[in-house]
A protein has these predicted regions:
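Conserved ATP-driven motor cores of ASCE-family P-loop NTPases powering translocation/secretion/packaging/pilus
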Residues: 203-304
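P-loop NTPase motor domains
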Residues: 1-211, 226, 293-314, 322-324, ...
Length: 379
C-alpha cells in the first residue's frame, strides 16, 4: 500500500536525485501504517480508527517538535519501540538523515496523502469494506467502481483499487497452486483518462494466474501520454485480443491499426490506347487489408477483431439488451447518511505502545548458586 501511494506509477527511474526521499518516504509511511494497525485497536464502542486518514493525521502530528531537545515527535515515538521492531527498521532511512532531510521526507508523505482528504472519500475509506479478495475470487460476483466524471481528483482511486486488489488476488492464486479458482477480469473503461499506475505487472503476471485486464481506450496516444512510448508498446504487445471501430475522421490510431492488420496481394492493371495500337499490363501489388480511410468509414456497430493465432475478422457487435439480456429490477445503491469518522492521535498511539511494552513479562535471568563467586575466587 505504501509503495502504491508514494510511487503509483511504479517507475523508480524517474526519481533521479530525489530517489532517497521517495524511498525514505515509502519506508516511513509503511512504519506508520504498521504502528497504526498494531497499536490502535477499535475503542470500547467499536469505533474503527485504523484508516488512511488517521495515517495522515499521525504523520502531521509527529512532524511537530516534541519538546525533547531537537527531536521530532516521530523520533521520540521510534525511541519508545524495541530495537528489533519492524516499524523502526522501515523508518531507518528517515531517522538517520539530517533534520532538514527528515522534514523533507515527512513532507513528501503528507503531499502523497493529501488526495485522501475528502469528506466523500472518508465515508468509503474510513469504514470496513465488504470486499474480500478470497471470497471475490471463489464466488460468482462483480465489483463496480463508478467515479464522478465532474471531479477528476478522485480518479486515482481506480488505479489504487486495481493495484491492491490484483496483488491480493496474486496471493490468493499462489495459495491455490498458482491459479485462481475462477477467472477474474478487470474491465477498465476510459483507462486512458485515468492517472498512470503500475499496470504492466498485471499483463505479465496476471495471465498465468487466470487474471485478465481489458483496457478500453479512445486513442493509442492516451497510453503513450501516460506510460511513455515504451510503456505504451508493452501494453499493446501484451493484448492478445484487440477490438476496434468507430474512428474519428482525423484519427491517427486508424493508421497504426491499419498497419497492424497487415496486407494482401491484389491484381492491378492498366490499359493504354493509342492511334495505331493498344497495350494492356497486369501486375500483382501489395495493398493494406483495410486502409485507414476504410477503417474510418466503418458503419456504426461494425468492428474489427484481432486475435492471437487467427486472421482478423470483421463483425457486428450489438449492445447487451439486443441479445435479450435484461435485469429483473434496476440496481439501487443504498443510501448512507453521513457517518461520524474517528481518528487516531499521537498521544493515543504512544500510550498504547508504552502500555503494550510494559505489560509484557520481563525475561528472567538464571541466578547463580550462593557462594559461586567466592568459591571461584578462592580457587
Amino acid at each position: 500500500l505504501a509503495k502504491t501511494i508514494v510511487n503509483p506509477g511504479g517507475d523508480d527511474q524517474d526519481r533521479g536525485q530525489n530517489a532517497f526521499f521517495y524511498d525514505a518516504a515509502e519506508g516511513l509511511l509503511t512504519s506508520v501504517i504498521l504502528l497504526l494497525a498494531e497499536y490502535v485497536p477499535p475503542d470500547s464502542s467499536g469505533h474503527e480508527k485504523r484508516h488512511i486518514v488517521s495515517v495522515f493525521k499521525l504523520v502531521q502530528e509527529l512532524l511537530a517538535p516534541s519538546g525533547q531537545g531537537k527531536k521530532t515527535g516521530f523520533q521520540v515515538l521510534m525511541d519508545n519501540l524495541p530495537s528489533t521492531h519492524k516499524a523502526r527498521w522501515f523508518a531507518g532511512a528517515a531517522l538517520n538523515t539530517s533534520e532538514q532531510g527528515m522534514a523533507s521526507v515527512m513532507s513528501t508523505v503528507l503531499s502523497r496523502l493529501n488526495a485522501f482528504l475528502d469528506s466523500e472519500l472518508e465515508q468509503v475509506l474510513c469504514f470496513d469494506s465488504a470486499i474480500d479478495a478470497e471470497h471475490f475470487a471463489a464466488e460468482k460476483s462483480a465489483i463496480f467502481l463508478v467515479l464522478p466524471e465532474e471531479d477528476s481528483t478522485k480518479n486515482f482511486m481506480a488505479g489504487l483499487m486495481i493495484q491492491n486488489l490484483s496483488r491480493e488476488l496474486f496471493s490468493v492464486a499462489d495459495e491455490h497452486g498458482g491459479k485462481l479458482q475462477n477467472r477474474v477480469v478487470f474491465y477498465c473503461d476510459e483507462l486512458g483518462t485515468m492517472p498512470p499506475f503500475d499496470i504492466l505487472p498485471l499483463f505479465s503476471a496476471g495471465r498465468s494466474r487466470k487474471l485478465t485486464l481489458v483496457p478500453i481506450i479512445q486513442s493509442l496516444a492516451q497510453l503513450e501520454k501516460n506510460y511513455g512510448k515504451e510503456g505504451a508498446e508493452i501494453i499493446s504487445d501484451n493484448c492478445q485480443d484487440t477490438i476496434f471501430g468507430g474512428f474519428a475522421p482525423n484519427s491517427q490510431t486508424a493508421e497504426t491499426l491499419s498497419k497492424a492488420l497487415g496486407s494482401r496481394t491484389v491484381l492491378t492493371g492498366s490499359v493504354s490506347r493509342g492511334k495505331d495500337s493498344n497495350s494492356q499490363s497486369l501486375q500483382m501489388v501489395e495493398r493494406a487489408l483495410l486502409s485507414p480511410d476504410e477503417l474510418k468509414s466503418l458503419p456504426k456497430g461494425n468492428f474489427i477483431v484481432m486475435k492471437t493465432g487467427t486472421h482478423p475478422m470483421r463483425t457486428k457487435l450489438q449492445l447487451y439488451f439486443k441479445w435479450g439480456i435484461s435485469f429483473e429490477e434496476p440496481y439501487q445503491v443504498p443510501e448512507r447518511a453521513q457517518r461520524e469518522v474517528y481518528y487516531a492521535g499521537k498521544e493515543e498511539l504512544l500510550m498504547n505502545i508504552k502500555k503494550s511494552l510494559y505489560s509484557q513479562p520481563q525475561p528472567v535471568t538464571a541466578s547463580k548458586p550462593d557462594g559461586y563467586m567466592s568459591s571461584y575466587a578462592e580457587k
